[in-house]
Amino acid sequence: MFTQCITVLFERAPTLADLKAVLTADASEAPAAEAEQGWVLTGPSLTLDHRKDVNGKLQIDVIDQPFPDAMGSPDREPTLFAAWSMGHFGPTTYPGALERACLHEVDRELVALAEKHTAFVRIRVSYVLGASSDATVLPDHYDPIHELAAVSHLAIDLSTIEGALVLFNPNAERLLTGQRLRTALDRAPILPVDVWTSVRRVRPQQLPDWLIFDTVGMGQLDVADHQLVLPIDHGTAVHAAALLCSMAAYDAAHGGVLSPGDTASDTDGRGVTAEWSSEATLGPPRAVLAWVPDDLEEIPQELDQPDLPEA
């Protein structure tokens, strides 16, 4: 039902009037019956046109609750469980996204801000709101890059409202400021995957002499995430984050052309080769293109276990 989702975490819930005051486009308020579906599915909301020719809508709703990081259960919290299952918090979002975002965030001030939030504003895209039951979820000539850019610009505007704390992209498990996002978008035509995704560096507890680098969030752009595992003293380690970011941007810009067997190299000429992995080493659950250094003879079997704890 929804193809993108970015949120703004707030110290207190803003009003729809607060939202309208910072928006440059005309927005219509949701009918009362729609807002009464329950805060999990739709809070008090505004709707803006995105692509009118295919019924594209940008929906912005106010949730006067903390971000629900747990999925709930079909027995005790059926509405929350259904909302997660239907992608109401993002099409590629998994439970625990905010917890993992805080765990991996280097800027601890952003984490402190996120921990203060009591409400959030959710920005989503849909092509089936108010449409007939046979409407397609994805229209012809669907462009996830243009779509995510539109949602990002709205998030930047909403981050200027009094009480806004930090942006949270649950699909990318990423915290960032509106200014950081604006700076990245202003670099166009360079694709800002460095803010649309998380590029993580993890030293596993069982094998502290190894490092795991990966991306989270490329599913927003309809391409695979990337992963690179290597010894901590390997020459590519200092280039790994930039290398993954570069390959992710290339893959997204060209519509997902990278595949197993493809090769790349870091700035010092050390080669890596792609393999397909149906399960990433680190959560959230997803398939990844796993890049392997050409001079690496073997990766320990322990690194094949999902969700390794950090050292």
Where are these regions (language model features)?
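Short, extreme N-terminal segment that most often corresponds to the first beta-strand
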Residues: M1-V54, P66-P68, A287-A311
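Conserved aromatic-histidine-acidic binding/catalytic patches
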Residues: T7, P139-E147, I232-T236
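Short beta-strand-to-loop capping motifs
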Residues: V8-P14, V125-Y127, I232
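Short, well-ordered alpha-helical segments
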Residues: A17, A149-S152, V238-A242
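Structural alpha-beta junctions
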Residues: S28-Q37, A149-L167, A249-L258
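N-terminal low-complexity, intrinsically disordered segments
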Residues: E29-A32, E36-A114
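Internal, hydrophobic cores of structured domains that mediate oligomerization or house catalytic pockets
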Residues: R76-W196
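Aromatic/basic-lined ligand-recognition segments
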Residues: P170-E310
